[in-house]
């Protein structure tokens, strides 16, 4: 889903109401012949233009899949502990995106942690728990995040 001048970095929302509303006009497909996201996806989760097999998607596996990381798809995520935005990163429309100015969406301290700091979370889970306060990352659950951090560290270069 793309917005001209913004790209694909935005939140979706819905409003539930009982009003009769006219539907918006269908948006133009701005992708054209571009396959950058399809080509870049490490798990081939984008199976054709505008079709995602969520069961292959690293974001789904690391956030939503309750059997992860016990399932047999472990090598697909390699050094990813939570989520993935590769498809977003390679989208040419995102060169127009601007960093969000909302303080609640600012990167947390842990974004710049090195391997030793991540390893510390394995012996001291409270370290990451404090970083997750009021974060969407809580959705995955602390136990799952710790398991994924452990897994990601095994694949992450020093």
Spans of features found by a protein language model:
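Alpha-helical scaffold domains
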Residues: 68-158
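Catalytic cores of enzyme domains
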Residues: 1-110
């Amino acid at each position: 889903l793309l917005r001209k001048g913004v790209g694909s970095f935005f939140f979706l929302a819905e409003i539930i109401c009982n009003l009769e509303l006219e539907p918006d006009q269908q948006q133009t497909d701005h992708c054209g012949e571009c396959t950058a996201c399809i080509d870049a996806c490490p798990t081939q989760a984008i199976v054709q233009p505008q079709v995602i097999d969520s069961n292959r998607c690293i974001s789904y596996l690391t956030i939503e899949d309750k059997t992860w990381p016990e399932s047999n798809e472990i090598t697909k995520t390699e050094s990813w502990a939570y989520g993935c935005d590769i498809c977003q990163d390679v989208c040419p429309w995102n060169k127009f995106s601007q960093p969000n100015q909302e303080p609640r969406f600012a990167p947390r301290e842990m974004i710049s942690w090195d391997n030793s700091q991540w390893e510390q979370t394995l012996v001291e889970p409270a370290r990451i728990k404090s970083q997750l306060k009021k974060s969407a990352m809580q959705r995955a659950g602390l136990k799952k995040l710790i398991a994924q951090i452990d897994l990601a560290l095994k694949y992450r270069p020093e």
